[in-house]
């Protein structure tokens, strides 16, 4: 008793319908949060600014990839964004004053890279707190993945006694020589 071409076609059709139905059901929900929040880009800028202000090396880090992992809504004006960033050292020095988004990435086997989780608290569309944790990896010829754990816990610069607060307004890696504004993410009436 052999299978006929009709049996094969029927089985294939059932399989395709099953896969199609499965894909429809997995994608059928309405999104809970709008991840295109106006402050999302500012949260990314504040995160990389905080990373660059806390790293010891002479060069800036730039964002290779980023995405919003989670949004916690506390009420209609207050929420927390959780971002995941892949970063890599750029060719620009910190002293250059350049926007890291305009700097080219360093290339080679010894270039520091990291994966970071950034938690950004927002109140009334203003960033009030940034906490970043990074897992840094450095590749070498002796070990293709020797890793060290680096945690950078960073909060509002005013709370840490520093007036440094940065964000990068321009985009387009390698297209600009640099000057960028540094908006203050804390509310003007808040003094601690």
Swiss-Prot record:
Where found, per UniProt?
A: Secreted
Name its species.
Gallus gallus (Chicken)
Gene3D superfamilies xrefs: 3.10.450.10
Posttranslational modification: Multiply phosphorylated at serine residues.
As given in the record, the signal peptide range reads 1-29
Name the gene that codes for it.
SPP2
Which parts of this chain are annotated as the region Disordered?
155-192
* Disulfide-linked positions: 92-103, 116-134
Q: Which Pfam families match?
A: Spp-24 (PF07448)
Role of this protein:
Could coordinate an aspect of bone turnover.
- The organism's superkingdom is given as Eukaryota
What is this protein identified as? Answer: Secreted phosphoprotein 24
Matching InterPro entries: Cystatin_sf, Spp-24
Its Gene Ontology cellular component terms are:
extracellular region
- List UniProt keywords, sorted A-Z: Disulfide bond, Phosphoprotein, Secreted, Signal
Which family is this sequence assigned to?
Belongs to the SPP2 family.
